[in-house]
Every structure is written in C-alpha cells, then in structure tokens.
C-alpha cells in the first residue's frame, strides 16, 4: 500500500472498514473512471492520455486473459 498516494490509502481504509461501499465489479469501476477522465476536455491532454492508455491496457489484458 505504501506505493499509493495518501488519498488512495484513505479510501482503501474506508472500504476495508465498511465506512465506504465496496464495488464488486472493480475492473468495470476502474474502466468507467478512466474513460471519464480520458473524455474530460477540462483536464490536461497528458492526464487524459495517461487515463486512455491505462484503460486500453486493461481492456487488452482482460480480453487476452479470457
């Protein structure tokens, strides 16, 4: 957990304690958020590219592993 930022660690603790809801479809949740970030024209192009690249890699790995 140390390699993740403070906000990620905080949300992890909240989910683990039951204070924040757990999403069973974690991959779907991640892809939805990455897609939203990639599509948000208010964000910098570099952030949008990182999100798009991460989403595309998840989609490829999910497809290849089936």
UniProtKB/Swiss-Prot annotation:
Q: Which InterPro entries match?
A: UPF0253 (IPR009624)
Q: From the UniProt annotation, give the residues forming the signal peptide.
A: none
Q: Which family does it belong to?
A: Belongs to the UPF0253 family.
The molecule here is called UPF0253 protein YaeP
Taxonomic source organism: Salmonella typhimurium (strain LT2 / SGSC1412 / ATCC 700720)
